[in-house]
């Protein structure tokens, strides 16, 4: 779901007005202002984004996406396994020097994604859909293909010269989150798909080819890639909500599956007999598969909440939490379901427990802060938003809501500091107008010192 509020408040690295105007002027004059060698093809291509900038973009945005997906799983053995498989493949790519990292995130929907600096994640949902280490290698190889072909950087380079957005060009597509889009927008959270790049069909074809190349040269059989494409093609034909975000960012078609089969039988035929490591995959994902029924119920609760079928959603989520009572994602999803119904006290109970289960993760703090604010528990709201800001700094909405809590407490100095910080990042919308009006009212700024 795309909202103007989401666009205005996401913590993207953007061009300054001066940078944008300079680039636009050079482009209109026909000047070649950026050229780099494609690390995959060896050919020169138009490129305005340096490798250092790719890494910076990654570092600034990936943490928000991982938090939106309920953080990296607390199963350290599973994360080590995924990172080991991914790192082995990454060593043989066209850009082995990139700071790659791999993890499984707690999200229940089916997806995997990469940020331009090499931060790569697979959701619990897609991990449960794979049946071999070779299929996992294919999945990670595909995402590595996007990083090595610099697909996001190429999109950014085009956007910098073609989008007339003087305030700056956002790196990634606006939120495509169909689940909780309204809730995320209403309380100022980052939606699940807000920071993910959307790839073209040509991007997907190139990443598929590179993925097969990378995984086979790492010793995996081509059947793993064909398995992955067959699974995705089957899901695409069914089009359940659990994969809506996956196919919004990674266009799927039967052509991709057919191409995988053809490549496996021709160009990569020598790798057909290489191992798939099914048993090794099953052994390393045993703890995850043990709670598969709970994860599926959490996903069902997601979908039902999105459809505003709250009673059925609560039933599904309660069943899931009976199986996995300390599942962070399940607790937060239930909290969101309660929040969507205006049940702030009940929502707070679940978000507070989630915070206890996974104290390093920030999303539960944000929800707890918002619920406490609605319940007029102002000290608690300040504490929760402060905890969130320490774990995941940079979301302007955190500063706005904490400022609002301070305002209600009569602590104008602290409120003014937060409102000022908020206005440095956001200058449109009801929240921005409220912050501005209060700063004027309290005498911190003069009405004519800042254009509204």
Where are these regions (language model features)?
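Canonical positions in the second alpha-helix
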Residues: 320, 353-354, 387-388, 421-422
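Register position in tetratricopeptide repeats
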Residues: 306, 340, 374, 408, ...
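N-terminal secretory signal peptides
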Residues: 1-19, 26-33
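Canonical tetratricopeptide repeat
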Residues: 333, 367, 401, 435-438
């Amino acid at each position: 779901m795309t909202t103007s509020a989401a666009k205005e408040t996401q913590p993207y690295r953007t061009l300054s007005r001066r940078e944008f105007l300079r680039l636009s002027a050079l482009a209109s004059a026909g000047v070649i202002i950026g050229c780099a060698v494609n690390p995959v093809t060896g050919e020169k291509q138009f490129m305005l984004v340096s490798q250092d900038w790719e890494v910076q973009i990654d570092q600034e945005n990936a943490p928000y996406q991982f938090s939106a997906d309920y953080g990296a799983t607390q199963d350290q053995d599973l994360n080590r396994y995924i990172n080991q498989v991914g790192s082995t493949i990454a060593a043989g790519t066209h850009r082995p020097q990139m700071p790659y990292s791999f993890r499984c995130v707690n999200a229940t929907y089916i997806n995997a994604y990469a940020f331009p600096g090499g931060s790569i994640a697979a959701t619990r949902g897609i991990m449960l859909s794979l049946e071999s280490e070779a299929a996992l290698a294919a999945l990670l190889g595909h995402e590595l293909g996007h990083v090595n072909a610099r697909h996001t950087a190429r999109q950014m380079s085009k956007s910098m010269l073609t989008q007339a957005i003087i305030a700056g060009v956002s790196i990634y597509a606006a939120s495509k989150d169909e689940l909780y889009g309204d809730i995320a927008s209403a309380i100022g959270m980052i939606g699940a798909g807000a920071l993910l790049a959307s790839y073209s069909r040509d991007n997907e074809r190139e990443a598929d080819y590179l993925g097969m190349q990378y995984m086979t040269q790492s010793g995996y059989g081509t059947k793993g890639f064909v398995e992955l494409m067959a699974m995705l093609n089957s899901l695409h034909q069914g089009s359940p909500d659990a994969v809506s975000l996956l196919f919004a960012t990674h266009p799927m078609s039967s052509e991709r599956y057919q191409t995988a089969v053809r490549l496996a039988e021709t160009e990569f035929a020598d790798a057909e007999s290489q191992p798939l490591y099914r048993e090794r995959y099953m052994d390393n994902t045993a703890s995850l598969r043990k709670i598969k029924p709970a994860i599926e119920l959490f996903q069902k609760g997601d979908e039902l909440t999105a459809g505003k079928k709250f009673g059925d959603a609560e039933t599904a989520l309660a069943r899931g939490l009976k199986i996995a009572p300390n599942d962070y994602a399940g607790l937060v999803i239930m909290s969101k379901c309660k929040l969507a119904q205006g049940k702030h006290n009940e929502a707070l109970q679940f978000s507070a427990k989630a915070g206890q289960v996974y104290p390093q993760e920030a999303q539960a703090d944000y929800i707890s802060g918002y619920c406490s604010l609605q319940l007029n528990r102002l000290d608690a709201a300040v504490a929760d938003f402060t905890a969130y800001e320490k774990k995941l700094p940079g979301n302007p909405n955190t500063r706005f809501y904490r400022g609002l809590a301070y305002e209600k407490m009569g602590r104008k100095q602290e409120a003014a500091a937060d409102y000022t910080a908020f206005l440095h990042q956001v200058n449109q919308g009801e929240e921005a107008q409220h912050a501005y009006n209060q700063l004027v009212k309290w005498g911190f700024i003069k009405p004519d010192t800042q254009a509204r």
